[in-house]
């Protein structure tokens, strides 16, 4: 039986456009061996009043709410996890925190900019409900990765690593 960590990451390639209003990011499952099959895409769009809108079109995910973050590095390859063992997606690095706040205060707080609202996955494994991240733009996310974690998100300093191993990038 094949098991893979269900955390997803999308490495977002930089484009030549100086101020792109939208970007489509292909998402792939990842595991401790690297990048796996495509599971869908995210459409990222800047909005004038609200911030970054993220419209998912994803399939094959476990049902429930998932932690959803922008990570520093555009590489979603495997690396060493917090327990010292090989783990999926660790090359993505930590959450995007350009002001070096070191704080996990959620998508509407004054902490790091990597927190996004949770991604809701329906009973059939599809994620199609858009979220808006008020403090991000498409330009902020370019050259980084987006990770969908295996579990929910408590937006705290205490990470639930057992439920937050990473799993999927897109280039």
Please report, for each region that a protein language model flagged, where it lies by residue.
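Gram-negative bacterial Sec-dependent N-terminal signal peptides
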Residues: 1-20
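N-terminal leader/targeting pre-sequences
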Residues: 16-171
């Amino acid at each position: 039986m094949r098991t893979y960590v269900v955390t997803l990451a999308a490495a977002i390639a930089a484009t030549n456009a100086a101020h792109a209003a939208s970007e489509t990011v292909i998402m792939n499952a990842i595991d401790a061996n690297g990048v796996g099959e495509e599971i869908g895409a995210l459409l990222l769009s800047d909005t004038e009043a609200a911030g970054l809108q993220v419209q998912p079109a994803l399939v094959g995910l476990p049902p429930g709410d998932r932690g959803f973050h922008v990570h520093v590095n555009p590489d979603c390859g495997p690396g060493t996890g917090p327990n010292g063992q090989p783990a999926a997606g660790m090359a993505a690095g930590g959450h995007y925190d350009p002001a070096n706040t070191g704080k996990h205060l959620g998508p509407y707080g004054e902490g790091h900019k990597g927190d996004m609202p949770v991604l809701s996955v329906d009973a059939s494994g599809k994620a199609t409900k858009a979220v808006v991240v008020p403090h991000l733009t498409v330009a902020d996310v370019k050259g980084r990765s987006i990770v969908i974690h295996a579990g929910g998100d408590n937006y705290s300093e205490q990470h639930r690593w057992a439920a937050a191993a990473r799993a999927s990038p897109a280039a």
